[in-house]
Amino acid sequence: MILVLEKEFARLEKQRKDLLSEVRGLTNVQQTWRPNADSWSLLEVFVHLMTAERNGLTYMTKKVQGIDELEKGGITSDLRLALLNSFLRLPVKYEAPAAAQFQPREYYDFKEIEAEWDQLRKEWHEFLDEFDKDSAEKLLFKHPIMGRFNLEQTLRFIYEHVDHHVAQVKRLKDNPNFPRS
């Protein structure tokens, strides 16, 4: 894997592992608690993150077939990324784009979700490992609102997206009604 992608991916993996360890020691009641019917539980936050990552990877896997036709990222995609990441840093709740929506399940198990996310990140690693510097600069990823990004920009967006939800995890755990066991 080229160095810039390797560094960004390592940063993503550390972030994910830290987030998982925030929730690992909690009971299933705590992990699946929702403050209200319209909110996500801790594990549903993880499912949302995985859904967004899965859909992004699936899209890019298809787009790579025509990579020679794609433009490279530049100042415009850098500016769009800066704007998107600025929005993610605001303490505002956004409706998830359709591509990141998921069908809630009756039951969630932390170990199953962790294993699914581990597998998904292995697939990401294998995908990223195939790119040289030139092809990694192509605008492969498409955010539903902010448009196309190259691979480094995509990994930076994913980091900010996860970070946005790290704050949500903290709010859930700090909620006065959060189950204590």
What are the residue ranges of the model-derived segments?
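Hydrophobic alpha-helical core bundles mediating ligand binding, dimerization, or RNAP-core interactions
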Residues: 16-19, 53, 117, 121-124
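Acidic/histidine-rich alpha-helical segments that form the ligand environment
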Residues: 81-135
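Hydrophobic packing residues in well-ordered alpha-helices of helical domains and bundles
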Residues: 5, 12, 42, 113-117, ...
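Extreme N-terminal tail/first-helix region
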Residues: 1-17
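Short, contiguous alpha-helical
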Residues: 33-84, 123-130, 134-181
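Short coil/turn segments at secondary-structure junctions
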Residues: 2-3, 40, 101-111, 149-153
